Amino acid sequence: MTLTNQMDFQNHFLAKDLHRITKPKKVGKRRHTDESNDEDASKPRFMPKTLSKLAQHKKQRQPQVMGQKLSVSRIIETLDQESLQNLISNLVSEHPEVAPTLLKISPQVTIEDSLMVLEQKLERILQNMPYRVDASSDYSFLRVKPHVEDFFQTLSDYTLNFLPPIESDLTVPLMFLMKFLAKCFPRLPKFHAVEYRYYHSLTVDKFNTILDDILVQFLSEKKHNIILAINQDWLTDFRKISELNDNNFSSVYERLKQEIDQYENPDAASGQPSTNNAGRLTGLANLLNFSSDNSPLHGNTVGNVFDTI
């Protein structure tokens, strides 16, 4: 091979090597990695203190809305009648000293309110009566005995509340008893149990005393009161009341009839002696007591129970 041919052969392979693709060296990447390591090393390390500041920052960004309990007025507005009644009862039990204040600021109980409560308690008696059993049997009475006792105790409380000197308007006790005896009292079951018959007989006896006394006081209080009784036809009302209650209040009817006859015929009744009813209700608060402690089965009643039945 000549010298010229050798040079051409070398140039051929040299040109071929120039077009060969070779892998890049990792010198630059290594240099970049080293620089990154140096940069990370120069940075401060992550400390727990920074995390605490971050948590504190997040906490400060939360809305500052705190919960609170309902006010007393809102609670009272929300409660139903039974819940409110239990609340006041518990309050008086825990703090008896608030009872006088409660009585002082409480609204006056009306006749309609009292009759509504008594009718509700009567409905409880009737709704709890056993089925397919004689309504007058002792078993029926025992089933509703707590409701019966509650009814008579409530009746006693309302009646005494409407009597003088608590109530100065004599028409209030008259209207209360007349409406009660016409609408509520006749609907009571006629139990044969001795305890119930005692309660019932005691009620009839004391209501006769109350009505007779209050009626005479009312008619003698003002001259035009007898005209009011005539115009409102009280005589018919008392006659119906007596008929609805097995004629147990016929004496009150006769008393009113006598007063009206005396007013309409003063000459015919001038020779009849007047009855003095002053002080007839003295001690009635002790006698008109339907508490379960005064039950004939407890032996705490005045006199012989069977004398009043």
Swiss-Prot record:
Species of origin: Ogataea parapolymorpha (strain ATCC 26012 / BCRC 20466 / JCM 22074 / NRRL Y-7560 / DL-1)
Localization terms from the record: Cytoplasm; Nucleus
Role, per record: Involved in ubiquitin-mediated protein degradation. Regulatory factor in the ubiquitin/proteasome pathway that controls the turnover of proteasome substrates. Targets proteasomes to the nucleus and facilitates the degradation of nuclear proteins.
Sequence similarity: Belongs to the cut8/STS1 family.
Biased composition (Basic residues): 21-31
Subunit-structure text: Binds the proteasome.
Swiss-Prot/TrEMBL keywords: Cytoplasm, Nucleus, Protein transport, Transport
GO CC terms of this entry: cytoplasm; nuclear membrane
Keyword Nucleotide-binding applies: no
UniProt superkingdom: Eukaryota
Gene: STS1
InterPro entries listed in its UniProt record: Cut8/Sts1_fam, Cut8/Sts1_sf
A Pfam family hit: Cut8
Chain intervals for the UniProt region annotation (Disordered): 20-45
GO biological process: nuclear protein quality control by the ubiquitin-proteasome system; proteasome localization; protein transport
Protein name: Tethering factor for nuclear proteasome STS1
A single GO molecular function term of this UniProt record: proteasome binding
Main location: cytoplasm
Record field: compositional bias (Basic and acidic residues): 32-43
